[in-house]
Amino acid sequence: MTVYKKGDIVLVPFPFSDQTFIKKRPAVIISSDVYNSHSLDIIIMAVTSNLKNSIMTNECEIKDYSSAGLLKPSIIKSAISTIDKSLVLKRLGSLSSEDSDSLNKILRELLAL
């Protein structure tokens, strides 16, 4: 079985917030490496390249999107989901250390840690 790490960008069927539809989209793994190595699930946040609206305070830009395996500038949305690892279609890349730091900052703010 593939071992996923925090900060990996994966392609997954991600549910819409109303749970009525599912769309294949990139997501970033936010669960810890220890959790990922022992669990059948991973915890993810949605990634979007739809930059029409300004970035909200609980979102962060992926500055090094090419290292993340993304084709265009993207942001990490605040939509969090837990999915079975078997639903991962493929690993696209991983966040740079700068983008990982930005994600950790957003997680601390979003979850009041």
Language model features: what each stretch is:
Residues 1-113:
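Conserved functional hotspots at enzyme active or ligand-binding sites that engage polyanionic ligands
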